[in-house]
UniProtKB/Swiss-Prot annotation:
Species in which this protein is naturally found: Kosmotoga olearia (strain ATCC BAA-1733 / DSM 21960 / TBF 19.5.1)
Annotated localization: Cytoplasm
UniProt keyword Oxidoreductase present: yes
Pfam family, one: Aldedh
Record protein name field: Gamma-glutamyl phosphate reductase
PROSITE patterns recorded: PROA (PS01223)
Amino acid sequence: MEELIQKARSVKKASIKLQSVSTVQKNEALLQIGAALKRKEDAILKANKMDVKEARDKGIRDSLIDRLALNQKRIDDMIQSCHRVAGLKDPVGEVIASWVQSDGLRISKVRVPIGAIGIIYESRPNVTVEASILALKTGNSILLRGGSDAFHSNMAIVKAIKEGLSRSSLPVESIEIVESTDRKLVEQMLKLREYLSLIVPRGSNRLIQYVVENSSIPVLETGVGNCHIFVDDSADLEKALEIVDNAKTQRPGTCNAVETLLVHQSIAAAFLPMMADRLSKKGVEIRGCSQTQKFIKVKPATDSDWETEFLDLILAVRVVNSLDEAIAHIQKYSSGHSEAILTENYFNAKKFVENIDAAAVYVNASTRFTDGGQFGFGGEIGISTQRLHARGPVGLEGLTTYKYVILGDYNVRR
């Protein structure tokens, strides 16, 4: 507990210094971090192999090991992220709006850092880099608490980040990591309101709900991805098949992978067999409703399947009679992450977009695009499914708040 408090104090102190650093200083730090990751890549990969071995020994399924595993390309992606974020416009100091009152006061709404941020996350060591560089670019410090399954990887990555910071003008304490895997520290971290201004949980629904229910610090809720695709009766079936394949099989362990496929009854006989043939060859287990089972031989879907984020090569399939029925199903089971319609009908697309409440609503595109990098944000600290203060992929702007700056001429209120 003492170590946790000390590190929280350190990031709080660093956040005060970061408020006034220049964009040039921040960008230089990001480039130094990228260079340090390159120098330390062998050590990072070696540490990651330890984590992957431990995960396999525990019987963790392959789709989750994929989230944990690093390789040369993923290290290179981390390094490129440092360069990419350094090249993005710095939102801090941006004048969002300004006006002059009748009494002569000049009021400006100015974007500023949030302060010291805590992030609690599971499995994915690339989050360590992504969260750190986005925080630094926006003038925030960050206290990291990664999952025990990625412990060795995270420690090696943070060591590299701190080496990069030591060669910059930013405080080395801008990035700290909780070095204990004791789960009790998570509960204690959620009470450090004196030091942390925001908590960001990334991981399972169980983790996210625990943080939301137990934190005394404001939470940026990154949600579960129970994502749907509806294949409308006017859809181009060949193109629709490509999208369903991509959304399910490219990286099934991610939160933007599709979990439930809804198919209009008028094209079910044509689409379902071709879909089942293609996906089964890639190892996908299909669970279908009673109508689906009339067209293809699949495992029966249960009620719980409609509300499950599988994070695996499993797809729940339901045949619906209309667009309205598809919308009603999504409204009932959606986690508010990413939802898609595949259609050639403009009015159906418009109705779907207007009636689906999610962070990202797609027309004729894969749900896999819900990602800060794919949206042009340079990365993300998480994908928010809440409405305040940020929604969808949370990039640089989502890690800022604002203050009002008022310029007067010795004005007094009358």
